[in-house]
Amino acid sequence: MVSIRLPDGSVRQYEHPVTVAEVAASIGPGLAKAALGGKLDGELVDTSTVIDRDASLAIVTDKDADGLDIIRHSTAHLLAYAVKELYPEAQVTIGPVIDNGFYYDFAYNRPFTPEDLEKIEKRMQELAKKDEPVTRRVVSRDEAAGYFRSIGEKYKAEIIESIPQSDEIKLYSHGGFTDLCRGPHVPSTGKLKVFKLMKVAGAYWRGDSKNEQLQRIYGTAWTKKEDQDQYLHMLEEAEKRDHRKLGKQLDLFHMQEESPGMVFWHPKGWALWQQVEQYMRRRVNDAGYLEIKTPMIMDRSLWEASGHWQNYRENMFTTESEKRDYAIKPMNCPGHVQVFKHGLRSYRDLPLRYAEFGSCHRNEASGALHGLMRVRGFVQDDAHIFCTEDQFIAESIAFNTLAMSVYKDFGFEHIDIKLSLRPEQRAGTDETWDRAEQGLRDALTACGLTWQELPGEGAFYGPKIEYHIKDALGRSWQCGTLQLDMVLPERLGAEYVAEDNSRRRPVMLHRAIVGSMERFLGILIEHHAGAMPVWLAPFQAIVLNIAESQAEYAQSLAQTLQKQGVRVAADLRNEKISYKIREHTLEKVPYLLVVGDKERDAQTVAVRARGGVDLGVMPVEAFVERLQEDLRSFK
């Protein structure tokens, strides 16, 4: 007798072992038809999996996130099947699920073209319509390796030969195609109805640039066509908002090969940067932080003491001078500890909050670099709080409040919060971790925030809160962190004199709100599609004269506004006014101030707001008041 407990708590009993598919059928024909897999005691399995013991089971359908993963994984195999049918000489390698889709890497003697992708996708649709059953068999490692060697699939054979000999190997087959995979997969190809191939890119075998270059075909797959259409629309919108494209269009920044992963900021881009930095400086100053500046290059001995030299050296830029080894800092924390240590600290000095817009460098792989989003040289809005155990909850509450307020000011309303908990390998006692984790929970609760817990995802030196902001396209970006550190103060000898005159280690909180300034500016540009809020815009207004006779008034008006703190310029070029309006509209300037003879004579201005909204003619003072109203909450 086999007892199966279902998600609703009910128990079904069977006189003999049953498959997941048979359990689904016993519940109802609709569920049997919809079943894509099962979750057996928490493990994702195929519908053909036999259950021969008492267990809990959830039937997985396309309404579940796991069901969508199964569909995408199976579609990757369908892609490989189609490629092998159309291009038999192509060799298959790996094909995993990724965010919003999948990819498969192939070795082939020529590049795949867009026309090839159309043929492959058409063949995939034909194979899916055949509704061929997907079967699984378990074989020994040697048998699997021998099979793939015999059909000329050397990459698959190499993967298998790297697996321990005692491990069982799962092979999945549909039609004339067999692939190596852990599974699970859909019961038949007919379940794969909504998919699209997206692009081809280069990739290296096993991710090693010393190995052969492969071709990676990316695709997306969904349960409903509406979901796919929505995703494709989002991609189109994301392409329009691409910060690299807008950076060029709006003349904000550029990057070039002579300095990979470093940014050349243009005047308008640097004006935007300054608005963000000055705003953040005001906020941390108001929150009781002390701004400091630490060296960019420090001796190897400090990095050895902190542990970075041993654990992070391959990501650090190093140099040598007068027979001493140095590293350009990849992070600011060791330098902040040095400032804390400079002089004897008392419990009366705590909490101490040190902030720095610290310039850091990390030797990221060239292939991973991506505009402002992944760079080698970056500035962090970094801060470290040194406090007592009794103070860290209050400090965490204050930081949560500050971070949420900052994100709202920048236009981000939806923040997902994740709490990473203790890993298996960790420093400190269970009691210390209990206090640390519960303290962060209490701080989040006190702020009325909800969060997702990630067991085992914390750093070895302490638990961490992550703040993921959602942009206008629904994409999630991790920006902020609050990391409790139980190790670095001890490694670097930070201590304070407690009330009983004993020496104690401070609790150290690493914290950032925007994280990398470069990356955050990239996110901001895409979130606002380049149309920055008035308080952030590089130029808040441009004064445009219609003819030469108004040039002096236009220039005087710009100077008057400038003295009142408005970021403004005058465009006095001898061009048609329609041309100038169009040009500055494309530059997404919030306000265009047009002056003709009437405006000059009346000392007024014709105001056009972004989006072509005509606000009419008004006195200069009225425009300034309107602008100040826009800015009031950020002063």
Curated annotation (Swiss-Prot):
Zn(2+) binds at C333, H384, H510. Its EC number is 6.1.1.3. Binds 1 zinc ion per subunit. It is an enzyme of class 6 (ligase). SUPFAM superfamilies: Class II aaRS ABD-related (SSF52954), Class II aaRS and biotin synthetases (SSF55681), TGS-like (SSF81271), ThrRS/AlaRS common domain (SSF55186). One of its GO terms (cellular component) is cytosol. It comes from the Bacteria. GO terms for molecular function: ATP binding; metal ion binding; threonine-tRNA ligase activity; tRNA binding. Residues 1-61 form the TGS domain. It is found in: Cytoplasm. GO terms for biological process: threonyl-tRNA aminoacylation. InterPro entries: aa-tRNA-synt_IIb, aa-tRNA-synth_II, aa-tRNA-synth_II/BPL/LPL, Anticodon-bd, Anticodon-bd_dom_sf, Beta-grasp_dom_sf, TGS, TGS-like. Its cofactor is Zn(2+). SMART domains: tRNA_SAD. Keywords: Aminoacyl-tRNA synthetase, ATP-binding, Cytoplasm, Ligase, Metal-binding, Nucleotide-binding, Protein biosynthesis, RNA-binding, tRNA-binding, Zinc. It catalyses: tRNA(Thr) + L-threonine + ATP = L-threonyl-tRNA(Thr) + AMP + diphosphate + H(+). Residues 242-533 are annotated as: Catalytic. Homodimer. Catalyzes the attachment of threonine to tRNA(Thr) in a two-step reaction: L-threonine is first activated by ATP to form Thr-AMP and then transferred to the acceptor end of tRNA(Thr). Also edits incorrectly charged L-seryl-tRNA(Thr). NCBIfam families: thrS (TIGR00418). Belongs to the class-II aminoacyl-tRNA synthetase family. This is Threonine--tRNA ligase. The lineage of its organism: Bacteria, Pseudomonadati, Pseudomonadota, Betaproteobacteria, Burkholderiales.
